Amino acid sequence: MVDTKCYMPTYCLYFTQRRCEYIYIYNSPNFFSDFIRKNKKNKRPNIYQLIFQRLLIILYLCALVIRWRYGLFFSGRLVRERNMFSKELKEECGVFGVWGVPRAAEVTYYGLHSLQHRGQEGCGIVSVNDKGELQRVKGLGLVTEVFNTENLGSLHGDMAVGHVRYSTHGGGGIENVQPFLFRHNSGDFALVHNGNVVNSAQLRKYLEDRGSLFQSTSDSEILAHLIKKEPVERNSPRIIPIMEALNMIEGAFAFMVMTNHRIYAMRDKYGLRPLSIGRIGDGYVLSSETCAFSVVGAEFVRDVEPGEVVTIDHHGIRSRKYSDYQRHAMCAMEYIYFSRPDSDIEGRNVHSFRKESGKILYRESHVDADIVVGVPDSSLSAASGYAEASGLPNEMGLIKNRYIGRTFIQPSQEMRDKGVKMKLSPVRSIVKDKRIILVDDSIVRGTTSLRIVRMLREAGAKEVHMRIASPMIKNPCFYGVDMSTHKELLCYSRNLEQARQAIEADSLAFLSEEGLFEAGHRSDLCLACFNGNYPTALYSSIEEVNEEHKF
C-alpha cells in the first residue's frame, strides 16, 4: 500500500474501478501501458468503463499541462515551494552518526534536531540491531514530524546514522530522502551524504551502462553503486572499494557509510564540507556541525581531514588517506550563513567569525546613521560586531515569525509577494524616523533585500543603508548550495550602483575578500561564488551553465 503521508505532497491520484484498483502517481512513465495491461481482462467493457477510461486520460493530460505550466518537470519544485517564506539561500543537508552508544537512534534523533537548520524537507535514521540487521525510518518533513515515540522505539542498537535534507540536486520526494539503504551479497550498508558530486552525470551513465539500477535521482547514491561494483567477500572491510570509489568522485562531500559492524566517515580532498568527530564514553559520534555535540553530551575530538577516510569500530578510530592530493578549501558560506553560531569549524567559532566580519565591515564602509539592525537570524552576530565598532545602538528592528514557512499548498503570486512580510515584521517604534544600517549576511537574488528595505521605509525609516557581511555573489555554486545559474544572481550582471538601485537602498556595501580572510583568521577558503575560482573541475555542472547562455 502506498504511504499517503509521504506521497500526497507530490499530488497522487487515486482511482478505483469495479474489477481492478489503480494507484497512479503521475510521475510514472508507465501509466498507460499499466492501465491497458490491467484492462485486457475486460473483453467487453461497458459504457461506464469507457467513460471512466476517458476521464482518466483527461485527468492525466491535465496533470501534464499543470506540470509544464509551472515548470515542474524534473525540478522538484513542488517540494521546494513549501519553503516559499524562507531565506533565499539553502544548503543541501546535515549528517549525524553514532557508534558504540546505547540507544543510538535516540542520540541521532537529538543530533538531527541540532542540525535541522541545514535541511527541512526530509530526514531519516538507520540503526543496526543486535542481530546485525539494518532498520530504517525516514519521511518528508521536520525531525519532529517524521519521528515519534513508536517509530523511534523500533530502531534498536548502539549504531546509527541520520540525515536532514534540503534538495539542491535530484529534486524532492521520499525516494531522495536519506539515509539510503543498500542490500548486497557482501552485507547490507547505509549511506548519508552532505554536498554535491559535480561529475554525477558521467558517473551515473558509467554505472547504468554496467547494469546499475538507481532507486533515486540524488547524486548521493552514486557512491554506493561505485562501492557495490567492486567484489567484496561477505563481512570483510569495505575500505578498499570505498577508497577506489572516492577517487572516481569529484566535488564536495562529507559521506558516512555504515555496515553492521563499523562506520566509515570521509571528506572530499578539498575539505569543502565540514565533518567532526566527538566522543561519548567509550563510543563516538560524527556530525556536520559541532553544535550537536553539546546536545547529546559528546566531547569534541577532532575534524575529519580533507581526503581522509576514518573507520570507527571495536578497534577504535583508524585513518587512511584516499588521495595523495589534499588541501583546505572550506566553503566560506559555512561561516557566513549555513552553520549555527555555536558551532566551531576547523578551530574557528562561527559567531566569532561573523562578529569580526561585522567590525571589519564598519571599518571598510562606515556611514552616518542612528541604529544598526540585523536581519534575523544568521546576520545578528555581524550586526553586533558592526554596532560595537561603530558605537551605534544595536536594535531589534526586525522580528522573525518562526512558525511561518512550511506549507504543502502551491502558493499564489499574491502569497509569494506577502511572504517576507509574513516572516519578518518591523518594530515601528524603533525604526520610525531613524537612519538605519541594515546588516545582512549575503545577497543572492536580491528579492528578499528589496522587500525588507521597502518594509522598513513603510514603517517610517528615513534612510536604509545596506551592509553585507560577505563579498558580492557573482557565480553559481556547484558544491551543494542552492544557486546553480548566473541569471538568478543579483550581482552577476550588475555593478555596485546598479545593485543598490535594484534593492532601493540609500547605500550598499559588501565585505571585501581580504576582510573575509581577516575575520576567519585564514585564507584557505573556497570563494568560488564570489570570484569564480572553483577548486575542482566542474564537468556536467559547467555544461549546464554554458547551456544557459546559448540563447
Can you describe what each PLM-predicted range is?
Residues 429, 434-448, 454, 492-505:
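Phosphate/diphosphate-binding loops
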Residues 3-10, 14, 19-29, 62:
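Compositionally biased low-complexity segments enriched in histidine and/or tyrosine
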Residues 391-437, 447, 474-481:
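Short, glycine/charge-rich flexible loops or terminal/linker lids adjacent to PRPP-binding catalytic cores
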Residues 76-306, 311-369, 375, 463:
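Conserved short alpha-helical segments that host acidic/polar catalytic motifs at enzyme active sites
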